[in-house]
């Protein structure tokens, strides 16, 4: 075999930095669950780090299923590159296709402790960031819920405010009520009454009446003399071109919405 040095490669001795995962249990299913519980929420913790599996804390005859922990590490974006084992463990450890590594450090040495502290610091920082992100999400949800509640309360207050008008509405006049409106005099031709709630007219309605204008399909229009130019509830309207039923025209009646159709009914007051 030629001993001539090749210009295309060079073999050197060197050290490769790797995390050492010291296994403290032979229960690989439990170990998998612990690893996932600790690191799954922070998928960038390992960031393609290489890891050596330290088996020296296990019994020589444990013969653990290292495939489980190797697959779990791969899920967490880490790669097992070898095992550190005692002589009595090497025969079964080699079955998983990982090379046997010599560790210059002893368990409990300063180097191991420094590595452990670095790993703990990274895990703590990742957990702190995850907790901060969760707190921010919860605060956003609380703020949105509070805004929705405030809007609902404001809407309820508006709806409880009833406008009262005791003068006739002349042609060209318009009133707008954020809740219900009660009118005690005539609404003339050309006048317009608009309300987010109900419209009560204890006089002839000859102009236009639009109730539930913000989409309140439960709003109604009442009049003691129903002769409108136009009636509308939640945007569904009817004009004077459509003749009112005889029992409604000029009578005490109400208008309501059912299945997106205007229903006109005479009121028989007792």
From Swiss-Prot:
UniProt keyword Cell cycle present = yes
Q: Which InterPro entries is this protein grouped with?
A: CAP/MinC_C, MinC, MinC_C_sf, MinC_N, Septum_form_inhib_MinC_C
UniProt KW keywords: Cell cycle, Cell division, Septation
The lineage's top-level taxon is Bacteria
Q: Give an example GO biological process.
A: regulation of cell septum assembly
Q: Which family does it belong to?
A: Belongs to the MinC family.
Q: How does it assemble?
A: Interacts with MinD and FtsZ.
Q: What does this protein do?
A: Cell division inhibitor that blocks the formation of polar Z ring septums. Rapidly oscillates between the poles of the cell to destabilize FtsZ filaments that have formed before they mature into polar Z rings. Prevents FtsZ polymerization.
Which NCBIfam families does the entry mention? minC
- What is this protein identified as? Probable septum site-determining protein MinC
Q: What is the lineage of its organism?
A: Bacteria, Pseudomonadati, Pseudomonadota, Betaproteobacteria, Burkholderiales
